[in-house]
């Protein structure tokens, strides 16, 4: 009888542990397992911080990299360095039970360092707009905040569906997206930004380049002759002013030089869908300018 009761007790403990453990696949295709909901999370990228808040885990983020400035509460999170150079001693002192890294912009050395802490590491790198709500759901599972994550994911998917319905059949607009001016670099078809552009009916003039964020020349942009040029408005980013001297470019002739908020387009977090809507609006302006000529 005692042996039977002991067996039942052990079975119950094993079942409980199995139910508590959660495993998801990260964007590197690796399994990430937490034995219980993560309560102390470290974010190694600004877009990751936004994803964690969107998943209902903002109060659980105990450390974040510089420029993690959204939502407002994120500004008060202790800093651990930059996405390329973290202070590993600060990370250790925070005693995290989950670390979320940026798959391509956090260096391999940094990821190896945090792995050696024995803490589960989720590598984040959303490649499409659809993967943003999916990322929210997976992070919500790891933190045990599924209800909040599901609500956010549902809303994001609804917004995406609305944009697709609105712009699915719009005429294409050949577009140059300028990330920085010195050096002049852009984003290729391998980036999530191009997925957003396609949703709007935009065609990235550097879609076929193999590098995600290639440096390009002014001459190559002039030769491609884009119908629209989009740059970002951050303090240290180059604007569209440099193109005004090139009157032969279609974007200049048609007054299709646009400036958007880079935080909404260069971070693969929930707000990127808002940024996509803004991009769609300016590309629609370009179509109207085309019709008016």
Question: How would you describe each model-predicted region?
Answer:
Residues 65, 190-213, 233, 258-259:
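His/Asp/Glu-enriched short active-site or ligand-binding loop at hydrolase and phosphoryl-transfer sites
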